[in-house]
A protein has these predicted regions:
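Bacterial N-terminal signal peptides
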Residues: 4-16
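Short, polar/acidic, helix-capping and beta-turn segments at strand->helix junctions
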Residues: 2-5, 19-162
Length: 162
């Protein structure tokens, strides 16, 4: 019993500290704005977080070859696959994304973009912007997406001094 009490006493501050450090993400759609579909108008992140900025991802595979030339569905799938890999490299997932900027050369293909987004993000609705552009970095590319994610800052372990 005494050991259990000692362990509880020692762990209590750690657990309280861990809870206090968790970021809070609040998604709001003000009634004064139109109802969004697949995104949120306002995303607030408070608390100690690590912010991750993902550069614009395009439809290139790991070897640098274009995937789905002329096929928005295939390009959108590759772009979201690349985003997933980039997020994972930073210890994040799509549920941590708070902002996405999407650039397309063909707005008439928006449904293919939405379908891929919905497959990867599910119910996650980050603040989002979608813009049609004349062209991207290479003429065969049809879609580029950048993302910002917020994840809890990991507690730093400091080695004990001797």
């Amino acid at each position: 019993m005494r050991i259990a009490m000692t362990v509880a006493f020692l762990l209590f501050p750690v657990l309280v500290f861990a809870q206090a450090r968790a970021p809070q993400v609040k998604r709001t759609n003000p009634p004064a704005l139109s109802k969004p579909t697949g995104y949120t108008h306002v995303v607030e992140v408070t608390g100690p977080v690590k912010t991750i900025y993902i550069s614009g991802q395009i439809a290139l595979d790991a070897a640098g070859s274009v995937v789905g030339q002329g096929d928005m569905k295939a390009q959108a799938e590759q772009v979201f696959k690349n985003l997933e890999a980039a997020l994972a490299a930073a210890g994040a997932k799509f549920g941590d994304v708070v902002k996405m900027n999407m650039y397309t050369t063909d707005m008439s293909q928006i449904q293919a973009i939405r379908d891929a987004r919905n497959r990867y993000l599910g119910d996650v609705t980050p603040a989002s912007t979608l813009v049609q552009v004349v062209h991207l970095a290479r003429p065969e590319l049809m879609l580029e997406i950048e993302a910002i994610a917020a994840v809890p800052e990991r507690a730093r372990v400091v080695p004990a001094s001797r």
